[in-house]
Amino acid sequence: MMNQTVKVKKKKKTITLGVVHIRASFNNTIVTFTDIQGNTISSASAGGNGFKGARKATPYAAQVTIDRASEKAKEYGLKTISIRIGGPGAQRESAMRALFGQNFVVTSIVDVSSIAHNGVRPPKRRRV
């Protein structure tokens, strides 16, 4: 008789409270779902979802990115989130609206955009 090996499916741990980090730059949108300690649950970016070039920085691309990342996070049982949003991009509002449409309980919204205190010199003016 042959020895049969039994494959045991690895059980995903359930996480009920998490943090959503949204980075909306001028060129892309990156969304990361983490637990309270900062361990990554799921992440997605507009470039990774098939958007290329200038379409990565659109509000629609941010909405699709939130949808993909939240589907993966819901597999872990995530229900309550805290939102940390940063960056100067125009897709910040649509990313937040997409999160509200995912039926999460939102406890707080924090803007973590870095503000330069006269740091680096800006690029030269564009002449057309």
Curated annotation (Swiss-Prot):
PROSITE patterns named in the record: RIBOSOMAL_S11
Q: Does the keyword Ribonucleoprotein apply?
A: yes
Identify one Pfam family in the record.
Ribosomal_S11
| CC annotations in GO | ribonucleoprotein complex; ribosome
GO terms of molecular function: rRNA binding; structural constituent of ribosome
Please indicate if the UniProt record lists Transmembrane helix as a keyword. Answer: no
What keywords tag this UniProt record? Ribonucleoprotein, Ribosomal protein, RNA-binding, rRNA-binding
Which biological processes are named by the entry's GO terms? translation
- InterPro entries, alphabetized: Ribosomal_uS11, Ribosomal_uS11_bac-type, Ribosomal_uS11_CS, Ribosomal_uS11_sf
PANTHER family linked to this entry: 40S RIBOSOMAL PROTEIN S14/30S RIBOSOMAL PROTEIN S11
Its quaternary organisation is: Part of the 30S ribosomal subunit. Interacts with proteins S7 and S18. Binds to IF-3.
Q: Tell me, what does this protein do in biology?
A: Located on the platform of the 30S subunit, it bridges several disparate RNA helices of the 16S rRNA. Forms part of the Shine-Dalgarno cleft in the 70S ribosome.
Give the family per the record. Answer: Belongs to the universal ribosomal protein uS11 family.
In its UniProt entry, what is this protein called? Answer: Small ribosomal subunit protein uS11
Q: Which organism is it from?
A: Rickettsia massiliae (strain Mtu5)
Q: What is the lineage of its organism?
A: Bacteria, Pseudomonadati, Pseudomonadota, Alphaproteobacteria, Rickettsiales
